């Protein structure tokens, strides 16, 4: 066996090993097209170590994060300026006819006149049946007998006062009205012998019976109208006809 072929193969093997890191398969084929055949690539190796940090990059665009929950309402702001007037609204419906003041005044006057007429009729009925009218006074009795204090209370209840004649005409009207002796609104309870009306005013008209007032029994502080129209002082605790006068 010749040594030359073996030596040739050994030399080629050494050359292939020396250039295995830098010579590609294509280069090898160019150098030794007839001898060296390329194998298939091997499997990938393990990842290498991390390299050094690179230089700082440029600032990126703002990101879009997740939208948060709605916060609580803020404080009320100051009132705004008044707004401009709005446009006129639609025309309303036609209203009911109004009442004329002249008609109301005329109606009130008519009603007042009718009421006055009715009151005049009532006064005439009362005058005819129970009382007497003299001037602007109306004298009225209920026909009951009672003490002087009760007569005062009865008359006051009807906003009247105990009958007090101020002249002969009024005294005569009361005399014609009563069928029994009646109390008059005259006393000397405050000062003995000084008879005054129930408002404390001195009398300007009197019609005492002969010998009166005499204060018989020392307690005759009230005045009685006798059937003959004369006056007599009597005790206020006695009971006599109630007689009131009403201003009209």
UniProtKB/Swiss-Prot annotation:
Its main location: secreted. Keywords: Calcium, Coiled coil, Collagen, Complement activation lectin pathway, Complement pathway, Disulfide bond, Hydroxylation, Immunity, Innate immunity, Lectin, Mannose-binding, Repeat, Secreted, Signal. The modification 4-hydroxyproline is found at residues 47, 73, 79, 82, 88. Gene3D superfamilies: Mannose-Binding Protein A, subunit A. GO terms for molecular function: D-mannose binding. One of its GO terms (cellular component) is multivesicular body. Residues 42-99 form the Collagen-like domain. It is found in: Secreted. Residues 1-20 form the signal peptide. It comes from the Eukaryota. One of its GO terms (biological process) is complement activation, classical pathway. It holds the Pfam family Collagen. Residues 43-111 are annotated as: Disordered. Hydroxylation on proline residues within the sequence motif, GXPG, is most likely to be 4-hydroxy as this fits the requirement for 4-hydroxylation in vertebrates. Disulfide bonds join 155-244, 222-236. Residues 82-91 have a biased composition (Low complexity). InterPro entries: C-type_lectin-like (IPR001304), C-type_lectin-like/link_sf (IPR016186), C-type_lectin_CS (IPR018378), Ca-dependent_lectin (IPR051077), Collagen (IPR008160), Collectin_CTLD (IPR033990), CTDL_fold (IPR016187). Residues 49-61 have a biased composition (Basic and acidic residues). Residues 134-245 form the C-type lectin domain. Residues 112-130 form a coiled coil. The coiled-coil domain mediates trimerization. Oligomeric complex of 3 or more homotrimers. Interacts with MASP1 and MASP2. Interacts with MEP1A and MEP1B and may inhibit their catalytic activity. This is Mannose-binding protein C. It comes from Macaca fascicularis (Crab-eating macaque). The gene is MBL2.
């Amino acid at each position: 066996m010749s040594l030359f072929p073996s030596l040739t193969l050994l030399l080629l093997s050494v050359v292939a090993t020396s250039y295995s890191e830098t010579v590609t398969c294509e280069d090898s084929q160019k150098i030794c097209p007839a001898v060296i055949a390329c194998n298939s690539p091997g499997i990938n190796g393990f990842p290498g170590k991390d390299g050094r940090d690179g230089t700082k990059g440029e600032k990126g665009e703002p990101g879009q994060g997740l939208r948060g929950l709605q916060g609580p309402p803020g404080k009320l702001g100051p009132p705004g300026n008044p707004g401009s007037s709005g446009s006129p609204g639609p025309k309303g419906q036609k209203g009911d006819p109004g009442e004329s003041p002249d008609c109301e005044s005329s109606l009130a006057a008519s009603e007042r006149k009718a009421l006055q007429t009715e009151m005049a009729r009532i006064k005439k009925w009362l005058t005819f049946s129970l009382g007497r009218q003299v001037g602007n006074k109306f004298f009225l009795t209920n026909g009951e007998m009672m003490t002087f204090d009760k007569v005062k209370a009865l008359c006051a209840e009807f906003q009247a006062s105990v009958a007090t004649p101020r002249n002969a005409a009024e005294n005569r009207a009361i005399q014609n009205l009563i069928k029994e002796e009646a109390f008059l609104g005259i006393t000397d309870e405050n000062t003995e012998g000084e008879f005054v009306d129930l408002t404390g005013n001195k009398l300007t008209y009197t019609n005492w019976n002969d010998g009166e007032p005499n204060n018989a029994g020392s307690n005759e502080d009230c005045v009685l109208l006798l059937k003959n129209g004369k006056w007599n002082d009597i005790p206020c605790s006695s009971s006599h006809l109630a007689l009131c006068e009403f201003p009209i």
